Amino acid sequence: MNALDASHVDITSAKHALPSDGVLACVAPYLAELGFAVEIGKKTAEKIRVPVLYRNNGRVSKAFEADAHHVEGKFVVEVEAGRAVANNQFLKDLFQACMMDDVDHLAIAVRNVYVAAGVKNPDFDRVVTFFETIYASNRMRLPRRGILVIGY
């Protein structure tokens, strides 16, 4: 994604240990320029809610939050940092994107390397291997047209 490429020098995990909100803040202007609605804070009005379930008269009864959402492109972006692999956050992102109404594409941005307690963890490689395993095994069909994993 061009948004992360444009911000690479400011967000690369080789030099920085930004939290996910810090990474999102760096790429938000580029995503917004592409037509994405982007989370700008932690208050309810600043979050991006994507419908999951509806009740009578089309009112949303359940929605999940995303870091960025492009309605016309049917695209959701999630930016993760330290807990992407350690806490299986990327799996939660996958599940929620699969439940979202009218979303065909998911991009998950994770650190290339996450350092915890002095140990380097290859988060990007682990997430990619996980998704490759899902697709290669052909045992689980995901209701998405595409998943993009971006390392930073």
Predicted regions and their residues:
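Active-site-adjacent loop/helix micro-motif of nuclease/hydrolase catalytic cores
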Residues: 78-93, 117
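Short internal beta-strands
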Residues: 107-111
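Domain-level recognition of nuclease-like catalytic cores that cleave nucleotide substrates
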Residues: 112-152
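Charged, often low-complexity linker/regulatory segments
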Residues: 1-9
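Nuclease catalytic cores
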Residues: 16-24
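Active-site metal-binding core of divalent-cation-utilizing nuclease and nuclease-like domains
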Residues: 6, 13-17, 30-72, 85-92, ...
